[in-house]
From Swiss-Prot:
F(1)F(0) ATP synthase produces ATP from ADP in the presence of a proton or sodium gradient. F-type ATPases consist of two structural domains, F(1) containing the extramembraneous catalytic core and F(0) containing the membrane proton channel, linked together by a central stalk and a peripheral stalk. During catalysis, ATP synthesis in the catalytic domain of F(1) is coupled via a rotary mechanism of the central stalk subunits to proton translocation. This is ATP synthase subunit delta. F-type ATPases have 2 components, F(1) - the catalytic core - and F(0) - the membrane proton channel. F(1) has five subunits: alpha(3), beta(3), gamma(1), delta(1), epsilon(1). F(0) has three main subunits: a(1), b(2) and c(10-14). The alpha and beta chains form an alternating ring which encloses part of the gamma chain. F(1) is attached to F(0) by a central stalk formed by the gamma and epsilon chains, while a peripheral stalk is formed by the delta and b chains. Keywords: ATP synthesis, Cell inner membrane, Cell membrane, CF(1), Hydrogen ion transport, Ion transport, Membrane, Transport. The gene is atpH. PANTHER family: ATP SYNTHASE DELTA CHAIN (PTHR11910). Transmembrane segments: none annotated. Signal peptide: none annotated.
Length: 186
């Protein structure tokens, strides 16, 4: 499984790097990032679309036509629309979530930012997000872009992943640590 994950990661990095170079040449990094975000929202909202990109059962022609129709309907044209079609034609749709994440990371590095993945038990308000960004900026010494994911199973607190560092202040982790400590005592 680790080999498959690194393979996807390698494909994602190469594809994202190529897309970034094209976007940089066209002076459209921000619009490409926005279009990728719109496609990612479609992806997260549709089980059928996730199945289409991950299943080897669909032919490349079927994937190409479906992705083209979805991109057109969503108004994703130009560089990202063409890129999605090429990825579908080359049977690399399975790597799209990784490509989008890698593109964001490359674009953030180009802007001198660092990206942080934040998991919280509930939606963070704008004020909470701004306070978190300011705190993380103090730690990292760079502007920080946060990608917030809601996971009610952590019960409370936050899990922040920034580069190779992870800060886990979730209630779930604290309860697990307490449970382990009580087992050692008893």
């Amino acid at each position: 499984m680790a080999e498959t994950s690194s393979l996807i990661s390698g494909v994602a990095q190469r594809c994202a790097g190529s897309l970034f170079e094209l976007a940089l040449d066209a002076n459209s990094v921000a619009s490409v990032e926005k279009d990728l975000g719109r496609f990612e929202a479609l992806l997260s909202g549709s089980e059928d679309l996730r199945r289409l990109i991950s299943s080897p059962v669909f032919s490349s022609e079927d994937q190409l036509h479906a992705i083209g129709a979805i991109a057109d309907k969503a108004g994703i044209k130009g560089l990202v629309g063409n890129f999605l079609r090429v990825v579908a034609q080359n049977r690399r749709l399975f790597a799209l979530p990784g490509i989008i994440a890698a593109f964001r990371q490359i674009a953030a590095e180009h802007r001198g930012e660092i990206s942080a993945d934040v998991v919280s038990a509930h939606e963070l308000t704008s004020a909470q997000q701004n306070e978190l960004k300011a705190t993380l900026k103090g730690v990292a010494g760079k502007d920080v872009t946060i990608n917030v994911t809601v996971d009610p199973s952590i019960l409370g607190g936050l899990i922040v992943k920034m580069g190779s560092r992870q800060i886990d202040t979730s209630l779930r982790t604290k309860l697990s640590s307490l449970k382990l400590a009580l087992k050692e005592v008893g």
